[in-house]
């Protein structure tokens, strides 16, 4: 009587190994937690500038303050999250983490999984910032800062900003350089808002704000969301080309 052939152990595939390694990295990554206090400090500083009599102001006046405050705070939050997304991948590349990870998972798995965790981290930081801002404004004025639908779209815009920074980081791979390049890709929309509003309306920052419903001038939400997606697709295509050439995909 012959015994059944031994079944070879089933090994984990490259994507599973890459996901497991990335989850371990995210749990111990200090970078998001270093940015979180700075982000909360920014929110508290802006709220401290609100007039003390806001709580007894008429509802239209409070709504006007809410519009200006939300646009200002979330513009800054988008910029911070984008820089964080770029720093994560560039610091990993400089430390050799990406090169080592590709020995087991390959570029597609490594960069794809890192993009997903960057998106999730951006959504987490954006959610914490939005809840803190909403709570503080509610206490100060007695009214909500953003309707639930607008808050959801704003969170999506913050997630897109994290991906934007990540893709810029994949292209550049320099932690110092992304501190200047990422803002340079977003800030011009604010600088051109008064000089050339039609041009500013199609730039990345303005399309993200408009898609979230935080900008009450220019293109509508659907058109802005489509343009923002187009920007991400173009940048993503460029990042894929760079990865294919630099990382020998």
Segments predicted by a language model, with ranges:
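Short, membrane-interfacial amphipathic segments enriched in basic
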Residues: 1-19, 196-202
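Secretory targeting signals
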Residues: 5-12, 30-32, 36-88, 111-175, ...
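Short helix-terminus and kink motifs of transmembrane alpha helices
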Residues: 87-95, 193
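Short helix-to-coil transition segments within interhelical loops
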Residues: 100-108
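Membrane-interface capping segments at transmembrane-helix boundaries
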Residues: 240-249
């Amino acid at each position: 009587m012959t015994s059944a052939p031994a079944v070879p152990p089933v090994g984990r595939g490259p994507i599973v190994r890459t996901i497991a390694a990335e989850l371990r990295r995210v749990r111990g990554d200090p970078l998001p937690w270093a940015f979180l206090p700075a982000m909360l400090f920014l929110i508290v500083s802006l709220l401290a500038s609100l007039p003390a009599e806001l709580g007894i102001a008429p509802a239209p006046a409070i709504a006007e303050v809410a519009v200006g405050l939300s646009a200002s705070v979330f513009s800054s939050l988008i910029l911070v999250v984008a820089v964080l997304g770029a720093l994560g991948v560039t610091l990993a590349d400089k430390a050799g983490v990406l090169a080592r990870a590709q020995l087991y998972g390959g570029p597609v798995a490594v960069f794809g999984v890192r993009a997903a965790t960057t998106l999730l981290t951006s959504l987490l930081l954006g959610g914490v910032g939005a809840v803190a801002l909403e709570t503080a404004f509610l206490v100060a004025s007695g009214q909500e800062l953003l309707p639930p639908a607008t808050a959801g779209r704003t969170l999506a815009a913050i997630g897109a900003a994290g991906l934007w920074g990540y893709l810029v980081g994949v292209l550049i791979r320099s932690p110092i350089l992304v501190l200047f390049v990422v803002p340079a890709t977003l800030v011009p929309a604010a600088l051109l808002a008064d000089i050339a509003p039609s041009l500013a309306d199609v730039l990345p920052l303005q399309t993200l704000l408009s898609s979230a419903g935080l900008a009450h001038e220019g293109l509508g939400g659907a058109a802005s969301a489509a343009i923002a997606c187009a920007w991400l697709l173009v940048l993503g295509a460029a990042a894929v080309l760079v990865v294919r050439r630099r990382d020998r995909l």
